[in-house]
Regions:
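Compact, glycine-rich, soluble single-domain proteins
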Residues: 42-56
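A general structural signal for well-ordered alpha-helical segments in protein cores
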Residues: 7, 55-59
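C-terminal binding/interaction regions
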Residues: 2-16, 65-127
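Histidine- and/or cysteine-centered catalytic micro-motif in compact active-site loops
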Residues: 31-33, 42-43
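Active-site catalytic pocket residues across diverse enzymes, especially alpha/beta-hydrolases
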Residues: 62
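Short Gly/Pro-enriched turn/cap motifs at secondary-structure boundaries
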Residues: 18-21
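Short beta-strand scaffold segments in enzyme catalytic cores
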Residues: 23-32
């Protein structure tokens, strides 16, 4: 796993962010189990609550060519600062990568079980 390249891809993605309100440019980069590298950025609009986090932009890219599973993800600001996913995005990442998905964190790469302990998932839904 080349975390340096993944982090650089996240910074590059942040350069494309549309963030005229918060001015927080966010980029996410993820590695798929089949080797694909995905990149996405955040996008805001004037009705503040309807913006999209960078991590959400990864999902259509993952599933459009046929799916897969995320195995590693890094999130960075436009200045290269490490950013952790918000709570909503942590749930999304759990769905797309499961407990083994590695997330870049201040302590280095950690599994989703540390980022979202006791996660809610499909097993919690009625059969």
């Amino acid at each position: 796993m080349d975390w340096t390249a993944l982090r650089a891809a996240a910074v590059e993605a942040a350069s494309h962010a549309y963030a005229p309100y918060s001015r927080l440019h966010v980029g996410a980069a993820a590695l798929v189990v089949d080797g694909r590298l995905l990149q996405a950025c955040n996008g805001e609009n004037a009705s503040y609550g309807r913006g999209l986090c960078a991590e959400w932009g990864l999902v259509p890219q993952l599933h459009s060519p046929g799916g897969g599973r995320l195995v590693a993800m890094a999130c960075r600001s436009g200045d290269g600062e490490l950013l952790m996913p918000c709570g909503r995005c942590r749930q999304l990442l759990w769905e797309q990568g499961g407990p083994e998905l590695l997330i870049d964190s201040p302590r280095g790469p950690v599994p989703m079980t540390e980022v979202l302990p006791d996660a809610f998932g499909a097993r919690d839904l009625p059969a």
